[in-house]
Amino acid sequence: MSDHSSQMKDVWADMDTTATEPVQAYLTATGERLRADGCEVRTEDWGGVPVLIGYRGDFRMRWMATKLHLFTVAAPTTLVTADALQRFTATAMDYVLARKGQLRGFQNGVAVFPALVGTQVEPAASAWAQGGQQMKFAAVARPVAVDAGSGRASAYRGNPALGFIYAAHLRSKLNAYFPVAGT
């Protein structure tokens, strides 16, 4: 088994990945929002768990003539914990870097919205998601903790010091794919 395959299984350690009706409905709606925005959308098997993958690439001169490869990676769980979201974020980042990250930094950037969708979200998971983006060289992750029952999607929606040229774009896409509850 490859290291990546092992990591896929490890990410689910201590997690109940049952897709309850509200979780499945939220994931389906997220897939529809991704398609409506022009993303390529598919479902992949990650160690026995169906994971929603959305992808789009955008080029802007105002980004210093760079192309941003944006992935949305969303998976079901019953309880979103900070530890689970951190593991999932690391796995999602490795996944996108393996697909589009080889030439990053040379007029290419990679971003990912790793989202765990559950029927319960621990306050620590919401706080971690809202606390800031996770960075690697020319790559950024903005984790999302979703409570499928209330529709609340906790994520960093601010303006970071690093990667600021993409901030408005990432915030716009985050709001489109994971709208703030009540909007």
Task: Please report, for each region that a protein language model flagged, where it lies by residue.
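A broadly used, surface-exposed interaction patch
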Residues: 70-100
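Short, surface-exposed beta-edge/turn micro-motifs
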Residues: 67-70, 109-112, 141-142
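"Short basic amphipathic alpha-helical interaction patches in structured regions
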Residues: 85-88, 126-133
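N-terminal, charge-rich interaction modules
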Residues: 2-79
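Switch/connector loops and helix/strand junctions flanking conserved nucleotide-binding motifs
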Residues: 82, 122-127, 153-155
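Charged, structured surface patches that assemble and position nucleic-acid processing machinery
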Residues: 131-183
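Nucleic-acid nuclease catalytic cores
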Residues: 103-128
